Swiss-Prot record:
Compartments reported by the entry: Cytoplasm
The keyword Signal is assigned to this record: no
Protein name from the UniProt record: ATP-dependent helicase NAM7
Positions of the UniProt region annotated as C3H: 62-94
Domain of life: Eukaryota
Effect of A484H: Decreases binding to substrate
Lineage: Eukaryota, Fungi, Dikarya, Ascomycota, Saccharomycotina
Gene: NAM7
Residues the entry annotates as binding Zn(2+) 3: C122, C125, C148, C152
Keywords for this protein: ATP-binding, Cytoplasm, Helicase, Hydrolase, Metal-binding, Nonsense-mediated mRNA decay, Nucleotide-binding, Phosphoprotein, Zinc, Zinc-finger
Length: 971
């Protein structure tokens, strides 16, 4: 037995007899997962808590339950609290629970334990992150050595059997020879603590480190958050529903951002092309994985130490870590006090939260409610969910929809263009590789020529906006790209279209002189600044007014520089935006709106769980489908080898996808890659490695899958494939980081080749493609818990990025329990592509695929699936889209279709439809108008229905209970 600082092996001859650790039950998905905001750390039922003793803050007892056995408790070295190694009613041991929730990772054993007062650390390098640590046995029997997973466990050593490295944490608790399990008698005396209490106690400790379980026992009243509705009586009810959810999300985002202070960082200094100082810093994997950072985020960098007077500077993030480099780069704003560039250590960085995006969403809701000119009457009532008469625009259609010297449209694309040009509201569903960007660009081109008016083109992300702006530029349109001030120094593929660059290039006279003076001096006088701002604003307005198309993000549409009306708004990737986000460009005076997206792929990212559960994670695109608005689907895919498109087409698009490329066009001749079936470039390679907790304690990795991933990439390199052609997709940040590290340490070819291979999340690959995709599933445990691999949308994206070849690495035993993955495995088996063995000797996999058990869940009519926790099975319809009524994203569609078996509901729908048929008849004389945009006209024409509609809304709410009669629908 040795102390922590001596870096000598641990003598375990007197330790518990089970030191020869057998493969243990694997980690459960109830551990917190990165990018998984809906997942809970714990899922167990509440347990009674009376009659047990409370832990004492003055001794070495568990801060959760009070167990004080020296052999069972471990100290968290960050907060100096003690925790036991038992689960006792929770999904993870108390010490692991605490480490995960607190983001701590250094522990030490009790002085009276078998191993003594020992800080657990790596024998070679001294790293103390317990989530990184594992053990290997010495060639002599009675000694083990602790090594970190990477790099030390990857280093060959004659004295240690590093191939047998095992993590110290298995089954979500420390191995029993590190910290024993308490006796049954000790468990009975301990206080039972619920997962909910643990979460509250950890939150309490952030503000009061001396808090105990007694401080959180008092029940707290929490205001109930009503779910969003399908239909709204008026815009005020709409605003009252969405406004609180936006505030919830904003408050959560603010708390998250402001908690991300980075202390004791080392900085390297350089100069940007504009002569501004750049501060670059690298964080540990643990720290960088926890950060939620985007290009353009504002930060404060400051120094306080003995070597220089206190200094503080502000700037914007201009570069983030990626597959090719691991640094964050901050561009500092000009300041009278220069930064201490001669210093590199002792700096602290803090993020500045800005609620601009949330403020603009709230403003859009208010504008929608009170400004009748913000949107046409037709669109107003459509968004509220009222049944209004469909109208069409009497516009001259082009003889040919395809544009000369541009991509030729197929029939489904031409149909989409024709439909959109004549309708005030259109939904275009673009499955993977179907050319929705080409279709969108063609639509914008024709609308610009027909109406001779500016068009506002938006998307949730800057990448999507830039991509579409480039296409529109290629069509010869005058395109202006509006970016946030914080992103003006970030280079992109369309920087030449950026408004600030157009202002600089077109500056004349006084403005040109002021720009030159500003560049030379760095700062203008107060009077010059005032004049400069005025001239810039005037020039910006002139440029925007002369544009054919203005491109910006949805949030960017709320910029004051766009304080004008736009008749036509097109939103690309609209299914990735929340509804209030989409509303920002729409309330710029829209009379014609085109939403482009795919609700079978990834949806909006909502961090606050309550807001997500209440419905904020549903896009406007999806809700309109639920209201019966049928999207136009693009049906010809040009990306994937037809063998790769077969399963996604049948599973997610009712087999409607046609192939615009042949097998020959997507087959590499003379390839020597060992595909199981020659001519079918896909395989599911069964991997039976164990999942492990990653370095940050909140994610997962799988070493066997990472090792085989490197072997596949090396094999592709030897087959002539370039690094830029390969993409590795994994849902877990822990696996992403580990694969990058593993390839650099163990790749058998030039290390620079492996650096150029992109390894990223499913989200990062949405809308993109690679010639070859490797999908690492990671999850492998006896509980068959697969986390957010259950989300069909994530699987759809992962399966549809590859053009020439797809390799899936996963454990079929764990995945087969899920209905969707079961179908996928059966598909690969039927094709002869479900294999196991070594890459050079693949054999058909003989593992038995256990039939998944269907789950029956009762939900109210308007309820949504919690994608991460409830998507175990499909809705029981004959197809997977049910005529755009029920999608895998879990949205229940039109009542008249979804519940046709219920007489009362059918009668209700029919009566409502009859009323609106009368309205339609009365309105028919106005159907041929080019545009109906007077909200008062609709109000007058529909006044006889308003009171009926209000009553029907109330009846609709009362019918929630009827959903219990429809459990046979499986939704």
């Amino acid at each position: 037995m040795v102390g922590s600082g001596s870096h000598t092996p641990y003598d375990i001859s007197n330790s518990p007899s089970d030191v020869n650790v057998q493969p243990a039950t694997q980690l459960n998905s109830t551990l917190v997962e990165d990018d998984d905001v809906d997942n809970q750390l714990f899922e167990e039922a509440q347990v009674t808590e009376t009659g047990f003793r409370s832990p004492s803050a003055s001794d070495n007892s568990c801060a959760y339950c009070g167990i004080d056995s020296a052999k069972c408790v471990i100290k968290c070295n960050s907060c100096k609290k003690w925790f036991c190694n038992t689960k006792n009613g929770t999904s993870s041991s108390h010490i692991v629970n605490h480490l995960v929730l607190s983001h701590h990772n250094v522990v030490s054993l009790h002085p009276d334990s078998d191993l003594g007062d020992t800080v657990l650390e790596c024998y070679n390098c001294g790293r103390k992150n317990v989530f990184l640590l594992g053990f290997v046995s010495a060639k002599s029997e009675a000694v083990v050595v602790l090594l970190c997973r990477i790099p030390c466990a990857q280093t060959k050593n004659a004295n240690w059997d590093t191939d047998q490295w095992q993590p110290l944490i298995e089954d979500r608790q420390l191995l029993s020879w590190v910290a024993e399990q308490p006796t049954e008698e000790e468990k009975l005396k301990a206080r039972l603590i619920t997962p909910s209490q643990i979460s509250k106690l950890e939150a309490k400790w952030r503000s009061n480190k001396d808090a105990t379980i007694n401080d959180i026992d008092a029940p707290e009243e929490q205001e109930a958050i009503p779910p969003l509705l399908l239909r709204y009586q008026d815009a005020y009810e709409y605003q009252r529903s969405y406004g609180p959810l936006i505030k919830l999300e904003a408050d959560y985002d603010k708390q998250l951002k402001e908690s991300q202070a980075l202390e004791h960082i080392s900085v390297s200094w350089s100069l940007a092309l504009n002569n501004r100082h750049l501060a670059s810093f690298t964080l540990s994997t643990f720290e960088s994985n926890e950060l939620k950072v985007a290009i353009g985020d504002e930060m404060i960098l400051w120094y306080s130490g003995m070597q220089h007077p206190d200094w503080e500077g502000r700037g914007y993030i201009v570069r983030l870590p990626n597959s090719f480099q691991d640094t964050f780069t901050l561009e500092l704003k000009p300041s009278k006090t220069p930064p201490p560039t001669h210093l590199t250590t002792g700096f602290t960085a803090e993020f500045i939260w800005k609620g601009t995006s949330y403020d603009r969403m709230q403003d859009a809701l208010k504008k929608f409610a009170i400004d009748k000119k913000s949107i046409s009457g037709y669109l107003y009532y459509k968004i509220l969910g009222h049944q209004v008469v469909d109208i069409s625009f009497d516009v001259p259609l082009p003889k040919e929809f395809s544009i000369p010297n541009f991509a030729q449209l197929n029939s489904s694309q031409s149909n989409a263009v024709s439909h959109v040009l004549q309708r005030p509201l259109s939904l275009i569903q673009g499955p993977p590789g179907t050319g929705k960007t080409v279709t969108s660009a063609t639509i914008v081109y024709h609308l610009s020529k027909i109406h001779k008016d500016r068009i506002l083109v938006c998307a949730p992300s800057n990448v999507a906006v830039d991509h579409l702006a480039a296409k529109l530029r290629d069509l010869g349109l005058k395109v202006v790209r509006l970016t946030a001030k914080s992103r003006e120094d970030v280079e992109s593929s369309v920087s030449n279209l950026a408004l600030h660059n157009l202002v600089g290039r077109g500056a004349k006279g006084e403005l040109k002189n002021l720009l030159k003076l500003k560049d030379e001096v760095g700062e203008l006088s107060a009077s010059d600044t005032k004049r400069f701002v005025k001239l810039v604003r005037k020039t910006e307005a002139e440029i925007l007014n002369k544009a054919d198309v203005v491109c910006c993000t949805c949030v960017g549409a709320g910029d004051k520089r766009l304080d004008t009306k736009f008749r036509t708004v097109l939103i690309d990737e609209s299914t990735q935006a929340s509804e209030p986000e989409c509303l920002i460009p729409i309330v710029k005076g829209a009379k014609q709106v085109i939403l482009v997206g795919d609700h079978q792929q990834l949806g909006p990212v909502i961090l606050e769980r309550k807001a997500a559960d209440a419905g904020l994670k549903q896009s406007l695109f999806e809700r309109l489908i639920s209201l019966g608005h049928v999207p136009i689907r693009l049906e010809v895919q040009y990306r994937m080898n037809p063998y790769l498109s077969e399963f996604p087409s049948n599973m997610f698009y009712e087999g409607s996808l046609q192939n615009g490329v042949t097998i020959e066009q997507r087959t590499v001749p003379n390839s020597k890659f060992p595909w199981p079936i020659r001519g079918i470039p896909m395989m599911f390679w069964a991997n039976y490695g164990r999942e492990e907790i990653s370095a940050n304690g909140t994610s997962f990795l799988n070493r066997i899958e990472a090792m085989n991933c490197e072997r596949i990439i090396t094999k592709l390199f030897r087959d002539g494939v370039k690094p830029e052609q390969i993409g590795v997709i994994t849902p877990y940040e822990g696996q992403r980081a580990y694969i990058l590290q593993y390839m650099q340490m163990n790749g058998s070819l030039d290390k620079d080749l492996y650096i150029k291979v992109e390894v990223a999340s499913v989200d990062a690959f949405q809308g993109r493609e690679k010639d070859y995709i490797i999908l690492s599933c990671v999850r492998a445990n006896e509980q068959q818990a697969i986390g957010f691999l259950r989300d069909p949308r994530r699987l759809n994206v992962g399966l549809t990025r590859a053009k020439y070849g797809l390799v899936i690495l996963g454990n079929p035993r764990s995945l087969a329990r899920n209905t969707l993955w079961n179908h996928l495995l059966i598909h690969f088996r039927e094709k002869g592509c479900l294999v196991e063995g070594t890459l050079d000797n693949l054999q058909l996999c003989t593992v038995q695929l256990v039939r998944p058990q269907p789950r029956k869940t009762e939900r109210p009519m308007n309820a949504q699936f919690n994608v991460e926790s409830e998507m175990g099975d499909f809705p029981k319809f004959q197809d997977f889209d049910a005529q755009s009524m029920v999608s895998f994203s879990g949205q229940i569609g039109d009542f008249g279709n979804a519940f046709v078996d219920n007489t009362e509901l059918s009668s209700y729908i029919n009566n409502e439809y009859w009323n609106f048929e009368n309205f339609k008849s009365a309105f028919s004389q106005k159907q041929n108008r080019n545009e109906i945009d007077d909200r008062n006209l609709y109000q007058e024409e529909a006044s006889h229905l308003n009171s009926n509609f209000a009553r029907e809304l109330q009846r609709e709410e009362q019918k929630h209970e009827l959903s219990k009669d429809f459990s046979n629908l499986g939704i």
